[in-house]
UniProtKB/Swiss-Prot annotation:
The record marks 22 as: Involved in opening and closing mechanism of the pentameric structure. The chain crosses the membrane at residues 21-44. Disulfide bonds: none annotated. This is Small hydrophobic protein.
Length: 65
């Protein structure tokens, strides 16, 4: 019985800190993931725009010659 009471006491002291850390880390990690995804999408859209511009230039060059 002595072990059980020590375990319950430990978990009851530990649980609020665990919850607090979890509540702090969850939004931070979500923000990090979202910003990384936004950065990747911006890079992809810039690359796509660059490819479209070079393709249009190539087509214009073929038409002009």
């Amino acid at each position: 019985m002595g072990n059980t009471s020590i375990t319950i006491e430990f978990t009851s002291k530990f649980w609020p800190y665990f919850t607090l850390i979890h509540m702090i880390l969850t939004p931070i990690s979500l923000l990090i993931i979202i910003t990384i995804m936004i950065a990747i999408l911006n890079k992809l859209s810039e690359h796509k725009t660059f490819c479209n511009k070079t393709l249009e230039l190539g087509q214009m060059y073929q038409i002009n010659t």
